[in-house]
Amino acid sequence: MYEKQTLPNGVRIVYEHMPHVRSAAIGVWVGVGSRYESPCEAGSAHFIEHMLFKGTAQHSASELAERMDAIGGQVNAYTTREGTCYYARVLDEHLDRAGDLLAEMLFTSNFSETDADNERGVIREEMDMYADTPEDLVTERLIGAAFPGALGRPVLGRPATIDRLTGARLRSFQIAHYIAPRIVIAASGSFTDENIARLAAHFSWLPVRPDLTMRSGSYTPAFTLKRKAIEQNQISIGFPGLPTGAEERFTMALLSSILGGNMSSRLFQTVREKNGLCYAIYTYTASFLDCGMFGISAAVGRETEQRALALIRDELERFRTDGVTQSELDRAREQVHASVLMAEESTASRMNKLGYSELYLGRVLPADEVLARYDAVTREDILGLARETLDFDRVSFSAVGRLRPQEEYAQQLKG
């Protein structure tokens, strides 16, 4: 059972003891990602994530790296459209040191112009890496097209905006956005009350500040093509989805599992197993605080692309007309049951659940309640959501590769 403290300044601490483990995972979750940036600030949240590893008032970047390695654990971070997470997984005897290290990085980083110039090159290389990965590129372009504005902008920013972000501007962005109401500290594993008190002390000095205003987002049907000389065409189809906290999210997870979540799923069986038209095909959800998208991705040959798209459309139409069988629903439930319960055995997974749920949902659902929500979903619920979601009048499409004219894709998908 998890516990929660809220400090007087609004910082929240959620933690859960796991008996019989010798390690702990801690994370500092900051509810600030790329959708909180103005156009001229694009890429700031991600750039700051990099800069916090480049040296503090007490230690150089190399000394920070040595201190990380000296505790024999894993220390890292990542940025999304709606948040940034700095986390560590260590043996319980090193938990205080890991917490001290994260706090030092968060509050005393240098943001020197020399470090910013060097890290700018690293981020450009990261951009190039994603641009050379068609599976990532096609989804990034789909989200960018379907969610115009701040939400759709790349988390990494663009080269032109990155070039204008100085160390001083990044520090100003951090001061303005890393505020108490936006911070959640999550811990799971082996720890003591004293460990939690020490973590709290690192954040108790933050002043009380008004919360930030989020730039709104909404789904808009869009088509985007990127011509690239690669062997396979990477395609991604999008439909309007659900926001993070929607009650129907449990229904959507089962719908996604049945359509494209595993080897027995409809799309995998139809497009790959029965017709041999692809190696990989899967469904996914992209959920944000106020909107979302349901997506399907596949890698197909240029010569078989039209047939694969026709089969995908036919399967989706059949799904929204006929619904699912009881055996399909039973298999999907077992899949999510296994996923939920296996995650409960990992300190890192439980820490992530605590931090994510508190930050974006305002409440952590116990595993038993999550399973009960899945068990309550009926075939009729899935059919109703499928008919609402899989609407080809609101379809979006992204493709990367040796492509046909856009009108042909639009005609094939929209009819």
What are these regions (language model features)?
Residues M1-S23:
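N- or domain-start disorder-to-order transition segments that initiate the globular core
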Residues T6, H17, E63-M214, L225, ...:
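Charge-rich, well-structured scaffold segments of protease-associated domains
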Residues P19-R22, T80, I230-E231:
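Short strand-connecting beta-turns/loops that link adjacent beta-strands
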Residues S23-A25, M293:
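Conserved catalytic motifs of the protein kinase core domain
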Residues A25-R89, I258-L277:
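M16/MPP (pitrilysin/insulinase) zinc-metallopeptidase core fold and M16-derived inactive scaffolds
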Residues G27-W29, P210-R266, L403:
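His/Glu-based metal-binding/catalytic segments typifying zinc-dependent metallopeptidases
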Residues Y36-G43, P243-L255, L259, M263, ...:
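Short alpha-helix boundary/capping segments
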